[in-house]
């Protein structure tokens, strides 16, 4: 496995790993919805996903921004932070 992933930046690998984890959680939730075959339970599972999705997004963005923070000015970091906040506000309202 090290041979296959040897040239990949560790930060990019971490970010991609978080996205794979997120997709596994989503797939598991879909299977749970199908197995339970109940709308009420499906809504509960879906509400849990509403928490997991933004959490993975925030962690992934934090990992990436932490890695490139030294290369960016404070103004650009503020713009990125503002953009992330606006994305989260748009999703939840």
Swiss-Prot record:
Keywords on record: Cell membrane, Membrane, Transmembrane, Transmembrane helix
Principal subcellular localisation of the protein: membrane
UniProt GO cellular component terms: plasma membrane
Segments traversing the membrane: 15-35, 48-68, 72-92
A Pfam family annotated for this UniProt entry: DUF2619
Compartment list: Cell membrane
Keyword Calcium: no
Entry membrane topology: Multi-pass membrane protein
Keyword Transmembrane helix belongs to the record: yes
Name this protein carries in UniProt: Uncharacterized protein YqhV
